[in-house]
Regions:
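Conserved small/polar residues in nucleotide/adenosyl-binding loops
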Residues: 245-247
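Ferredoxin-type iron-sulfur electron-transfer modules and their immediate structural context
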Residues: 2-225, 229-232
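A generic structural motif
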Residues: 164-167, 237-241
């Protein structure tokens, strides 16, 4: 009986000593957490999409609290979240425009010529390994196999009649689809942009017309019609400088 009591006492004393030691070490090596970082993190939506350029919401919160990122850096939260974070940081929200993803192709199944019917893996990233880079005759357009659809965390992009179509209302401009498209057909543009070029072909006009009914042929008529001088034609494709367009 005495042995049991002694053993229990020894265990208790050892536990007490270890507890005190751990408590001391915890205080000595404790990492101070900025309360602003905690408050900012609480306002971020938590999607961890990476659209802000940081690894996730935790990393962005730390950067904002340290003054290394703008209060409006979260594309998902938008202006409402930016205002809340600005209040926490004691700053103001800068001018920002709502952005949305845009697919530079209108060559759907009805307008774009197909060389053959493809029934293989439905993934745009494997197309460089199949004949002609995919079934469509145009080697610049949307392949329509949905790599961008899989990448979107907001269900904002779908394949409709053979091409990717963005739902502007759902799009949070996180940029994941932009990074995923192997043909670099997707870019972020202002949400309210009305003048766009839905083509990326660099082929000459005659070649474009032979594979697509709606492709840009580089005729330069748009450059002559634009009163703002915002449209240029380079490599047989029209480009619009949206900063020069007065909507």
């Amino acid at each position: 009986m005495t042995g049991i009591i002694i053993a229990a006492a020894v265990v208790s004393i050892v536990g007490l000593i270890l507890g005190l030691f751990l408590g001391f070490m915890g205080k000595k090596f404790a990492v101070e957490v900025d309360q602003k970082e905690i408050d900012v993190r609480a306002e971020l939506p938590g999607n961890n999409c990476g659209g802000c350029g940081y690894a996730g919401c935790d990393a962005l919160a730390k950067a904002i609290a340290a003054g290394e990122a703008e209060v409006g850096a979260c594309p998902v939260g938008g202006e409402p979240v930016a205002k809340k974070i600005a209040a926490i940081m004691g700053s103001e929200v800068g001018d920002s425009k709502r952005m949305t993803a845009f697919v530079k192709c209108a060559g759907d199944c009805e307008k774009a010529k197909e060389n053959y019917h493809y029934t293989g893996v439905q993934d745009c990233t494997v197309m460089p390994f199949v004949p002609n880079g995919g079934s469509k005759a145009c080697t610049y357009g949307c392949m329509g196999y949905g790599s961008c659809v899989k990448a979107c965390p907001f269900d904002a992009i779908h394949i409709v009649n053979g091409i990717a179509v963005v739902d502007k209302e759902k799009c949070k401009a996180c940029g994941k689809c932009v990074a995923t498209c192997p043909r670099h057909l997707i870019e972020l543009i202002p949400y309210d942009a009305k003048q766009v070029v839905k083509c990326a072909s660099k082929d000459k006009g005659k070649d474009v017309m032979s594979v697509c009914q709606t492709g840009c042929i580089g005729c330069m008529m748009c450059t002559k019609q634009c009163e703002f001088g915002a449209i240029t034609v380079e490599n047989n494709i029209a480009h619009i400088d949206l900063s020069l367009i007065h909507i």
